[in-house]
């Protein structure tokens, strides 16, 4: 007999990987089972993301405290959900959404609702003696579990680094392997090889928020070149074993209708010119995925980008779709992009996150489950990626325990499930 009633909900202020406060929530059941989860936090954020509630009191944590969000959990959300069955994930989330009553969760804070929503799923899984990935799979009747292809951010520019490179993330995707464990090993080897390539050139090998290197390279193409050298040095083949992926985070350098690349001598591009610039990179290098290639408001530009590259590579909407099913539906209707980045703190509940994932899947869009640049030891996204058979996961580089905790959880899950690693099957145009 399950004792699934929620008897207590508690939240506290903890620190994330950048030393900023975030919120951790515990959901406690009648049986004594405790589910715990933490909310992550982003640096480059889409303007339509759900609101992360911060205190704004400059005398504490430079205004970044989350005491208000903690109080919202310990009072309003506590009153709302105590006494409910933890197995009613959708009902629990809908109660919080209805009570909040705003489009962007600005009353309770998406950091408050998300921490509770995920903690409830952890508690429910523990009460049923199920691994979290299996509980998540059961929520939507997902019968096939797969191991995701990792999108590894090994070189940083843009808002994630203090350097002259405009594109925010240069990533590798180890597609030519038969297991997640082997893919992870290849990624780690390339990461170490990249460090030695940079060292040889007298470049900085300190790492950024997500564990990637942020050397002072002269241009975006130079960043691609050093990664290709690192892949070659490890004995892998770029274009078959390992593909490249970019996150342009274009909204960060979109000013007055122009894309301005400071690292390229302040060159400015119109939407179509920048889309053509990206198409040129795809032609020249083994790039399989581009995220946020254009600004979140530039739907016309996105439409053109999709028309020239959409049948060749993955075009991921992050700031564009902000994990929001309504905005994703517009993208589907207008044939914009062909993939969605899933960041659950952009929307604020597990239920709405699953809605976005399954809407994407039903319409032939790939799904990439993602961390944020401000992370904790919480590894829920690893279970989410497997439990929804998402296909890909983006959780940073191959160092820093806030990133590696997700990879390690995926290794445990692979050992337990023997789930198939997606590899090349995940991508258009890869055989």
Curated annotation (Swiss-Prot):
> Which Gene Ontology BP terms does the record give?
glycolytic process
Which residues are noted in the entry as (2R)-2-phosphoglycerate-binding? Answer: 168, 343, 372-373, 394
UniProt subcellular location: Cytoplasm; Secreted; Cell surface
SUPFAM superfamilies under this entry?
Answer: Enolase C-terminal domain-like, Enolase N-terminal domain-like
Q: What class of enzyme is it?
A: lyase
- Give GO terms: molecular function aspect only: magnesium ion binding; phosphopyruvate hydratase activity
Report the record's disulfide bonds: none
Q: Which cofactor is recorded for it? A: Mg(2+)
Catalytic activity, per the record? (2R)-2-phosphoglycerate = phosphoenolpyruvate + H2O
| Active site per UniProt | 210, 343
| Similarity annotation | Belongs to the enolase family.
Assembly state and interactors?
Component of the RNA degradosome, a multiprotein complex involved in RNA processing and mRNA degradation.
Please identify the protein, giving its name as recorded: Enolase
Species source reads Acinetobacter baumannii (strain SDF)
Taxonomic lineage is: Bacteria, Pseudomonadati, Pseudomonadota, Gammaproteobacteria, Moraxellales
